[in-house]
Regions:
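Structural recognition of the beta-strand scaffold that forms the well-ordered cores
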Residues: 125-127, 143-145, 171, 205-213
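Auxiliary, metal-adjacent structural segments of Zn-dependent hydrolase domains
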Residues: 10, 41-142
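Catalytic Zn2+-binding segment of zinc metalloproteases
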Residues: 159, 163-181
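Structured segments of extracytoplasmic/periplasmic soluble domains
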Residues: 114, 118, 165, 169-173, ...
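Solvent-exposed loop/turn segments at secondary-structure junctions
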Residues: 132-135, 149-152, 168, 176-177, ...
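Short pre-active-site segment immediately N-terminal to the catalytic Zn-binding motif
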Residues: 144-163
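Metalloprotease/metallohydrolase-associated module, dominated by Zn2+-dependent proteases
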Residues: 184-250
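Bacterial Sec-dependent N-terminal signal peptides
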Residues: 1-23
Length: 250
């Protein structure tokens, strides 16, 4: 998935309340440098051929996301986390050598380690390419394009982008079509947290909503009062659903 553009003023469509254009850029302080990372170490493993998704390669058969599958032999590593999880990191061989590949991987892994385990639990691989393209989630994976990553890092939104993409990877398949989530959507009377979620309710509503609910519950003091009020007014039933998921995954 791509990320919606930085939010404009709140949108009103008829009786529906949609407070944000997209939620990734609502706050760059949901996770920050003060948060601990569960990432502990990175181990080089033998390079082997892998199938990776690269957004720089056009596939005209897809109308929602630029990119295509490629088969290459990337630099391979295993990342270890203190909660016992492991992730295979696949770094495109366009990077100069093992040292550069490892350096680039490390720049993201500490941030990924800040994500709650709930958001990381289905992440089995990470793909890292050059290029200024959207990040992606799903496929038990996090997709990174390094030039865009440097922009997110500069602007302070790298953690929030990973929250969004990891929600796709670890939460979509469990919740996007669940009875409880659909009932919560209906009970919110046509409201969505963002214009992006409303446009793609099956594909984006989970990833747009869960990170802000996480912020409400665990990082509330980092959100502006106006933002809190907008979230709570727009999607009270989705908030209850998210909180029940957090409680059951403690």
């Amino acid at each position: 998935c791509g990320e919606a553009k930085e939010p404009s003023n709140e949108l009103q469509e008829g009786s529906n309340f949609i407070p944000f254009e997209g939620t990734v850029f609502v706050s760059n302080n949901i996770l920050n440098s003060s948060d601990n990372s569960s990432f502990t170490s990175l181990k080089k493993i033998p390079n082997e051929e892998r199938t990776m998704f690269d957004r720089r390669i056009n596939d005209d058969s897809k109308d929602y996301a630029q990119g295509s599958w490629i088969n290459i032999t990337p630099f391979l590593f295993t990342a270890f986390f203190s909660d016992g999880t492991e992730i295979e990191v696949q770094v495109n061989d366009e990077f100069e050598n093992n040292i550069e590949a490892e350096s680039v991987a490390l720049s993201y892994l500490k941030v990924i380690g800040k994500l709650p385990k709930l958001f990381r639990k289905e992440v089995e691989t990470i793909w890292i390419h050059k290029g200024n393209e959207d990040f992606g989630g799903g496929n038990n994976n996090l997709l990174i394009h390094h030039d865009r990553g440097l922009e997110y890092l500069r602007d302070g939104f790298l953690e929030e982008v990973f929250l969004h993409e990891a929600a796709h990877t670890s939460l979509d398949s469990y919740h996007s079509t669940s009875k409880g989530w659909i009932n919560a959507q209906l009970a919110d009377n046509g409201n969505f947290i963002s214009d992006y979620a409303k446009k793609y309710p099956k594909r984006e509503d989970i990833a747009e909503t869960f990170p802000l609910c996480f912020a409400l519950e665990f990082k509330r003091d980092r959100l502006e009062d106006e933002v809190i009020q907008k979230i709570e007014n727009a999607i009270p039933n989705r908030i209850k659903y998210c909180l029940s998921v957090f409680e059951n995954n403690n």
